[in-house]
């Protein structure tokens, strides 16, 4: 498209098209034909299926684009931190803890998905950049303000790493890992408690052992239980887009048992002023995890849907998942060593028991 080099200027270089057509007709045997725009688009995307979906970039990265962008919009309203999950690893708790920090500002809540925007991994992406920006408050000239977003479905989204990097190449990425077996069981119990008919009609063991000839609804639930726990596979996808120095891999078990220590380490990674979370978090024996300390020295905990106590996983499922994740856990351990990151205790335990 010859007009692309003029994007942001005041002309489309139509004369260039005319000159090319005249040259081809005069000096070549190429036969030119025309077609309606929709037919041309279909032919183009048959040749370039990788371009079928848009890939949003930051308009402020190019001075020409910035000049034609609305003056009512801000270049600093995009997040600099992404909490990517996966689901059922403690991402909502981390979101809450991060929002306590005076430097960090979360996205505004979505009317349908609450604190998660889920922009990069579903049809919200097709709503465009303006839709995304509307969930972030302007900085109001405060250069110390850092925006962040949390969507736990980002971790294992096939298109997410590339889309995120195209728009937020300098962002810092936070992933939370717990035992993949516990994560799978927690997800099953989570949707079961929300009345999911598949989870209510099939046992956990039936779900995780379903083969590819099983009904689609059963295979879909199996995949949502098992696939996000293949941690090394998805981390490699993120590492293909982002530098390892931009990715923080957080131990979800420690986040639950020693949140203040985890937040201290995380603050160093984010390079933000230190905040003593020992004074902000207190263990609540009724909930079974740490909660925010309020001004009257009481605790403010997450909602009833968080921290539920489920029946223990049955022994048959435990053994199956231990075998199932052995290869993936081994790959994760090697990846962490390669990156110079600590191997969490839960991973050491699972490998020794495998």
Language-model features, listed with the residues they occupy:
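PAPS-dependent sulfotransferase catalytic domain
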Residues: 126-140, 195-265, 269-279, 323
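Short catalytic/ligand-binding loop motif for oxyanion handling, primarily in non-cytosolic enzymes
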Residues: 5-9, 92, 155-158, 180-186, ...
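Generic structural signal for small/hydrophobic residues in well-ordered secondary structure
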Residues: 90-91, 132, 148, 164, ...
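PAPS/PAP-binding and catalytic site of the sulfotransferase fold
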Residues: 13, 20, 92-101, 160-169, ...
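Acidic-and-aromatic substrate-binding clefts and catalytic sites of carbohydrate-active enzymes
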Residues: 7-11, 120-129, 152-158, 226, ...
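PAPS-dependent sulfotransferase catalytic core
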Residues: 37-152, 167, 171, 181-202, ...
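Catalytic grooves of carbohydrate-active enzymes
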Residues: 1-31
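The conserved 3'-phosphoadenosine-5'-phosphosulfate
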Residues: 40-45, 236, 240-327, 342-354
């Amino acid at each position: 498209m010859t007009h692309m080099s003029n994007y942001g200027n005041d002309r489309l270089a139509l004369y260039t098209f005319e000159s090319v057509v005249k040259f081809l007709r005069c000096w070549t045997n190429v036969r030119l034909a025309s077609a309606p725009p929709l037919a041309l688009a279909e032919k183009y995307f048959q040749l370039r299926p990788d371009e079928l979906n848009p890939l949003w970039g930051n308009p402020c990265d190019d001075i020409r684009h910035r000049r034609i962008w609305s003056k009512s919009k801000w270049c600093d309203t995009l997040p600099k931190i992404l909490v990517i999950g996966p689901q059922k690893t403690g991402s909502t708790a981390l979101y809450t803890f991060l929002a306590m920090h005076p430097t960090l500002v979360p996205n505004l809540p979505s009317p349908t998905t609450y604190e998660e925007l889920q922009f990069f991994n579903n049809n919200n992406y097709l709503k465009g950049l303006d839709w995304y920006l509307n969930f972030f408050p302007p900085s109001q000239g405060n250069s110390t303000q850092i925006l962040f977003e949390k969507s736990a479905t980002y971790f294992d989204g096939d298109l997410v790493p590339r889309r995120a990097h195209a728009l937020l190449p300098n962002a810092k990425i936070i992933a939370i890992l717990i035992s993949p077996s516990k994560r799978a069981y927690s997800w099953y119990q989570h949707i079961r408690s929300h009345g999911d008919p598949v989870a209510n009609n099939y046992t956990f063991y039936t779900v995780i052992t379903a083969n590819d000839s099983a009904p689609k609804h059963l295979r879909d639930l199996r995949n949502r239980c098992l696939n996000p726990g293949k941690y090394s596979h998805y981390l490699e996808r993120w590492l293909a887009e982002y530098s390892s120095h931009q990715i923080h891999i957080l131990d979800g078990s420690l986040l639950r048992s020693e949140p203040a220590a985890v937040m201290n380490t995380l603050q160093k990674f984010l390079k933000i002023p230190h905040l003593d979370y020992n004074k902000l978090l207190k263990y609540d024996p009724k909930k079974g995890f740490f909660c925010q300390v309020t001004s009257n020295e009481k605790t403010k905990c997450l909602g009833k849907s968080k921290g539920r106590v489920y029946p223990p996983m049955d022994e048959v499922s435990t053994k199956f998942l231990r075998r199932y994740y052995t290869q993936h856990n081994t790959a994760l351990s090697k990846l962490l060593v390669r990156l110079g990151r600590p191997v969490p205790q839960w991973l050491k335990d699972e490998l020794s028991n495998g």
